[in-house]
């Protein structure tokens, strides 16, 4: 709730056990799809091997941590009031890559279309049968940079590699400025 302003968008995969993604308002269908794809990737749908899921979004003003009178909300739950907008049949794909900022190696996770702007090298992943630790070791062995623990933390669940890519990332300072402007 601390990051969710009234006019921001609140994205949630339409499946129990999904993470919330908060983003500034946008009418751009491609941006909405990418945000929905990120929300879908970190949902339970990935962990159980589903390859598409619906994702809804609402304005921050429609979200409350308080239930209606006489009802109870479990810890971590929220109420959504009013009309939900849906992005249907979102493909579960996530790019996991790295970028070097000086001597520091950062692991980044992003929708596949955003990865070239954020990572030097990345893999587009889909739900699969390689456990997180095994997939992370395979990725780190190919990159020969960054740590296994950092890659494990970025993976949403059991995965397999769909494709490999290379990017030309913006400087970290530029990325930080974009997020500060939100």
Regions found by a protein language model. Give the residues of each.
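Extended, highly charged segments
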Residues: 1-182
